[in-house]
C-alpha cells in the first residue's frame, strides 16, 4: 500500500450518524476523508431493520425519534431527511383508576381540560403551562448555540437573562442550578402530571428527581432544547432513512466509507490500525492528520492503551413489537389512535418513578416498570409494506426506565424478565392483553424483540449500554474551563491534539443530532485555518 493510500487528512472511527456528519462536512470542505465502520452498514444506533422473519416492517431498532438534529446540518449537507410531527404529544392512563381515565395532551403541549379534571388535576392547568413557558425562556436561547463555539456557563446565563429578564433568571436557576424536581413539584401538585414532566429527565438516565449531581437536569434540558421547543419528530421511512441520507451525502461530497473495518488500535500520532471483515481478516494501517472518534470515551481509551475510566451506565430497555391492531383501552374518552400517536406513559407517575428507582438501586426489577410506548406507523405508515397496511397492522415501541443491567447482578435471563415486566406494565392499563394482538412471523412466532443495556454494549460497543456514551454534559463550558484550542472551543477535545471526539461522548453530542459530528468538523477546519495563518 502506498503512502497515498494510507495518508488522509481525516480518519473517522465509527460510522454512526455523527461520524457521517463529520465525514460529510470535511469532505465537502475538500479534505481527504476515510470513515471506518466496524459493522456491515453505517448508521450505528440510528438504523432500520426487518426484525421479524417474513414481516416487512422497517423498524427503528434502537434510536427512534428526532428532536435535536438542526435543520442547518441537513441543509448544509444536502441530506434529504424528512421528519413529521406527531398529532398528539402524549397520553397517560391514570394508574389510580387502572387506566379508566387519563390525560391526553395535544401537539402544542396543552392538556385537555376534561382530562385534567378526570385525573383531579384541574387546579394545575396554569402551573403546567407556566412551567413549560418558563423552560422555553432557557431553551430558545440555548438551542442555536449548540452548533457554535462553546459559551461559558456565565455567558450562557447572561444571554438568557438579558433576553427574558427576571423570569428567565428564575428558569435558569430551576433548570441549571437546582435539582429540577424542586421546580416540578412547585409547579404542579398532581402525582400523574408531575410524572409526565419528570420522565424527560430520566430517559437513559438512572437518577432521582432531587439528585444533587443534577444529571437528571442535564437529561431534562436536552429533551426540551431541540428546536428551542422540545418537540420530537418521527423520521419518515424510519431512523435508517436519516443515516442513509447522511451516508449518501458524505459519499457524494467525496468521503471514502469503509464498512467491516474493525479498529483495534489508535496512536496519538494519528495512526489507526484495523482489521477488514473478510476471510483473511487482513490488518490495515492508515494515518490521519486528525482522527475523529465516534466511539465511547471508554472505547477510545482502550484503543489508545490507556486506563479506562468508569462511565455512567445506561438505564433503559427497549421493546419493539408489530401488532395486528392497536390494543383497546379502558378509557372510553380517547381512541387507541389518539393514545398511541404520541408518547403513551405507563406507570410513570411521580411516586412510581421514585419507587422504581429505589427498587432498581437495591437490585430489584421495578414493579410496576415505568415505561412509555408510541406507534411510529400511525404518523408514518411508509415503514409498513402495503400488505401490512391493508391488514391494519401497526408498530409499537416501548421504552422502559430504571433498568441498568449493572444493578441486577446475574444477567442470565434478564431480557426475558424485562420483557415480562414491560408487558405486565402495559397490560395493567389496557382493556386486553397486548400479547393477544401481536402479529406473528413466518415461523408463527410473536413479533416482539427486546434490547437491553447489555445488548447495546455487546452489539454497538456502547459502554454500559449508555445511549449517550456516558453521562451527558451541560451544553456550555464551566467558567474556568480552558477554551484555548479549537477542539476545546467546540467541546470535542481529548488528551491528544490530533484526536477529537465526534460522537455522543462529545460535549453537546447526545441523541440523534449530528451536533457532535458537526462540531468536530468545525474544530478541524478551525485548526487548519489557524495553521495557515501562523507564520
Swiss-Prot record:
It is a multi-pass membrane protein. It holds the Pfam family NAD_binding_8. It is found in: Cell membrane. Gene3D superfamilies: FAD/NAD(P)-binding domain. Keywords: Cell membrane, Membrane, Transmembrane, Transmembrane helix. The chain crosses the membrane at residues 7-27, 509-529. GO terms for cellular component: cytosol; plasma membrane. Its main location: membrane. PANTHER family: PHYTOENE DEHYDROGENASE, PYRIDINE NUCLEOTIDE-DISULFIDE OXIDOREDUCTASE DOMAIN-CONTAINING PROTEIN 2. This is Uncharacterized protein Mb0921c.
